[in-house]
Structures are given as structure tokens and as C-alpha cells.
Amino acid sequence: MYVCGSTGEGFLLDTEERKLVAETVVNEVGQDMNIIVHVGCPDTRHSCELAAHAEKIGAAATSAVPCVYYHLGEESVYRHWTAITEAADLPFFIYNIPQLTSFNLSMNLFNRMLENPRVAGIKCSSDPAQDILRFKQAGGKDFIVFNGPDEQYAAGRLLGADAGIGGTYGAMPELYMKIDELIDRGEWEKAAQVQNLVTPLIYRLCSFPSMHGAVKGIISLDGCPMGDPRLPFLPVALDDPKLVQLYHDIKAAIETVKNW
């Protein structure tokens, strides 16, 4: 489980709130699954503070984007990530999402980071799907690559991603789990068919004033009250006809593939 990432609104929480979220998740489910805590902040000091806290509470690993807002060079990002790995004796996962950070991880910097024994993997959310292939080939079989873009999950797995971390998984986990199940059985064509059902649903989630509000709305309609996202992300009313229809369409898609 990936905590306080983009969909988890980590950047909209202050440091103490992020610590509380991470600690709550570890206490509730840390015995059943590995918890990766995203600790990236606009500055290195607070990122390191969160990394140390993640180790203290028993998280399995940390992860971080580059510092945001300022357009930093590779050496600055290298030192930022290295400082985080030194702040906690935990595996570290690079988070590459250039469309939000304005920093695209080069192979030169990636190879430098691979020299750090605590760098265990990467969440690859960059647009070119072939980045997954490049990072996996350079990192080796034990290096973990997470697919980021939900709309290419099946393709990302085909290119070498070991798993995925995505923003819409919570709204329709059964469909992503079905893709994994089919891939594990070697039924790639059927996995692609499920992806073809999933992708239009993703686009519809993203058509609302905020995807965060829509995802929380779908989960709330399914019986787990989520509340509203934190501003400036806008909420979506639970009685919004578009949201209700989307909820029913997700359920229909799940029913369609249930016995595949």
C-alpha cells in the first residue's frame, strides 16, 4: 500500500497530518501488507523528517518525488533523494512523475541512484510507456518497477512492471485485480480486454471537477464514507447523476469479468 501519494493528497497535508496518516495505516494494516510511505516534500528537511518517522513506526519502505515548485537540476535531485535514503534504514522507491514535478528522470541520474543500495525500485508515471522497459532492464530482475498511469496498466505489466500504484484503483479494485489474475495465468488478450473496459471508466472519473472527489464519491457510494477531498480539489456530490451512473457502470463491468 502506497500512503500519502498524489491521490492520497499528501502534498495538501502538513507534516504532522502526514505522520498521523502513515502511523494510522501502519497500525491498522501493517501486519498484513507492506506499507510504502511517500515522504516527498517541497524541501529536503521535512522529507527526511517524514522518512525517519516512517522507519520509527514500522513502515516497509519510503518513496519521494523530487522537490516541487523550483525547477531543480539533476545534482540537486540526486542529493535530495540521497538525503532521504540516509534518513531511514529502509528501501527507497523513486517516484518519477514529470507531468506534475516538471522533472523527468534521466537514465544518467537513474544509474547514479542505482549505486545506492537502499534504492529498491521506482514508481514510473512518466508518459512514455517504454520508460518502464528501460528502468526494468537497467535495474535488473530484483529491481521493482511500479506502473503509474492507470490507463496503461496491462501494457505496463507487459513491458516489465512488477505491479502498479494508481489513483483509480480504489474506485474499482476488482477490475485491476482481474487484470493481474489474467496476467498471472498468461491470458494477456483477456487482460487487455479488461483494460479496455477500465480505461473509459478512468476517463469518466477524470471528467469531474476533480478526480479525487470522484474516486472518493465512488468509494462512498460503495459503503465506505470517504468525505470530501481537501481544497483546492473540489468535491463531487454523492447524488450527482453522472457519479451515480458511473458507479453502476463500474459494478456492471466487474460483473462482466467476474468469471473470466
Predicted regions and their residues:
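Glycine-centered flexibility sites
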Residues: 5-8, 38-40, 58-61, 76, ...
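Active-site beta->alpha loop and helix N-cap motifs at the rims of alpha/beta catalytic domains
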Residues: 1-102
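C-terminal alpha-helical cap/extension of soluble enzyme domains
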Residues: 161, 168, 172-260
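Alpha-helical structural signal in soluble globular domains
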Residues: 20, 24-29, 53-57, 83, ...
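Secondary-structure boundary/capping signal
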Residues: 33-34, 92, 121, 143, ...
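Catalytic alpha/beta core domains of metabolic enzymes, predominantly
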Residues: 86-87, 98-199, 203-207
